[in-house]
């Protein structure tokens, strides 16, 4: 009887544990649904690393713990993640006080142990225009990018009255902290980041809160950063927004093209991965998976953005990627005809829209071909005479090498 009572108590304890416990500290329940995984093939001589270089957690104005960001990244198939908290804007500071601005990175790095995810240390320099918001990644110490001198409080309050920062409904302590931090010149914060060898990029230059017409424009401060070699990239894509003007700025000033989620809530809330949506990502073409190699690739501007169903990149980077994504194979001629069947395969998650620019026409398709991600299509081609080799040229309508210019690709196969 005593044994039965013990077993009953153990059963009750187990049940309570199941009811009250929601996973171990630092863990996230496993999701068996893999629909959100992003994949792109490597290019010749380099790895294609999938990254999100602008995200937030509760250590600034995000709403999840850093381990959630890590879990989301691994579920999406990301290789590289940066959690880039606002240095000057800290709306949760009363609830989550932390003096160390490296906290989010330390928590994320700990959560990523045992996975292949590379977590980069970074922060967001958060200022009024100019220069607006700028991310610095590969930092050694984020604290050195923040300067709070209480002697500047009177100046901070004076500036606060003049600036456009919206204080309505915001906690006064948070606003005062932001104002005081902004007295320290942005040039000093950017210089401090560069002293640590950071890769610095301009965030959401099209953001309507700082560019009322949504048009990205270089200010004199940005121009000087570029001239001095202190600004290395620019967001062409931020969340659901895209800037043609930022794309032009990048091309004209040799800045790396960056696309990010800038996620604050759950990724799944912003991008319904279960129905095929995805976060914007920056593809980085690196020699290996080390931080040193990733950093070298970014400084060499070897990036392509995947945004919605569009690939965006400079031609030197985008063409090799397309050559790895698209492959073609002949299955031979229909018996007694000059109609050739080929299989075109898409080796990536990106749906491609191809327009035929070759001298051949198709037997069962128009010149427009929809090539779904991770899939293949069959084409029947009227070659007019039997060939030993086939060459097709396509314009990729959703691959941009300039704001108004699509990429082209030539594919070959033996018959």
Regions picked out by a protein language model, each given a short descriptive name:
Residues 30, 34-199, 203, 236, ...:
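A metal-dependent hydrolase metal-coordination microenvironment
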Residues 123-126, 206-208, 263-264:
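Short glycine-enriched loops at secondary-structure junctions
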Residues 1-8:
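Bacterial N-terminal signal peptides that target proteins for export
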Residues 17-18, 109:
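Prokaryotic Sec-type signal peptides and long signal-anchor helices
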Residues 187, 195-223:
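Noncatalytic carbohydrate-binding groove/subsite architecture in carbohydrate-active enzymes
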Residues 88-90, 209, 264-267:
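Short gly/pro/ser/thr-enriched loop/turn and capping motifs at secondary-structure boundaries
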Residues 2, 22-52, 66-70, 132-140, ...:
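Charged catalytic cores and adjacent phosphate/nucleic-acid-binding surfaces used
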Residues 9-17:
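Bacterial N-terminal signal peptides
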């Amino acid at each position: 009887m005593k044994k039965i009572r013990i077993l009953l108590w153990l059963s009750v304890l187990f049940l309570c544990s199941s009811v009250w416990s929601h996973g171990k500290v630092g863990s996230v329940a496993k999701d068996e649904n893999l629909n959100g995984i992003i994949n792109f093939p490597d290019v010749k001589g380099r790895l294609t690393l999938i990254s999100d270089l602008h995200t937030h957690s509760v250590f600034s104005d995000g709403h999840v713990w850093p381990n959630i960001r890590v879990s989301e990244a691994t579920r999406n198939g990301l290789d590289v993640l940066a959690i880039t908290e606002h240095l000057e804007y800290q709306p949760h500071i009363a609830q989550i006080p932390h003096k160390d601005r490296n906290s989010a990175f330390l928590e994320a790095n700990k959560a990523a142990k045992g996975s292949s995810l590379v977590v980069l240390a970074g922060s967001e320099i958060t200022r009024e225009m100019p220069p607006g918001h700028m991310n610095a990644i590969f930092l050694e110490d984020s604290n050195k990018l923040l300067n709070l001198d209480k002697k500047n409080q009177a100046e901070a309050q004076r500036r606060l009255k003049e600036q456009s920062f919206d204080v309505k409904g915001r906690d006064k302590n948070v606003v005062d902290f932001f104002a005081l931090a902004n007295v320290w010149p942005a040039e000093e914060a950017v210089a401090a980041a560069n002293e640590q060898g950071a890769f610095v990029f301009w965030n959401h230059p099209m953001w309507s809160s700082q560019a009322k017409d949504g048009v990205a424009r270089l200010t004199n401060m940005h121009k000087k950063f570029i001239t001095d070699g202190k600004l290395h990239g620019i967001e062409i894509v931020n969340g659901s927004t895209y800037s043609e003007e930022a794309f032009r700025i990048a091309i004209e000033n040799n800045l790396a093209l960056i696309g990010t989620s800038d996620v604050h809530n759950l990724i799944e809330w912003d991008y319904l991965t279960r129905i095929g949506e995805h976060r914007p990502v920056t593809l980085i073409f690196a020699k290996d998976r080390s931080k040193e190699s990733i950093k070298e690739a970014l400084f060499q501007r070897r990036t392509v953005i995947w945004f919605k169903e569009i690939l965006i990149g400079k031609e030197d980077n985008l063409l090799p990627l397309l050559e790895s994504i698209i492959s073609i194979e002949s299955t031979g001629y229909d018996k007694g005809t000059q109609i050739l069947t080929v299989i075109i395969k898409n080796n990536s998650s990106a749906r491609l829209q191809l327009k035929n620019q070759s001298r051949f026409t198709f037997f069962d398709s128009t010149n427009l071909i929809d090539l779904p991600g991770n899939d293949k299509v069959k084409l029947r081609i009227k070659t007019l005479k039997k060939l030993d080799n086939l060459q097709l040229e396509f314009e990729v309508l959703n691959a941009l090498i300039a704001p108004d210019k699509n990429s082209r690709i030539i594919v070959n196969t033996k018959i």
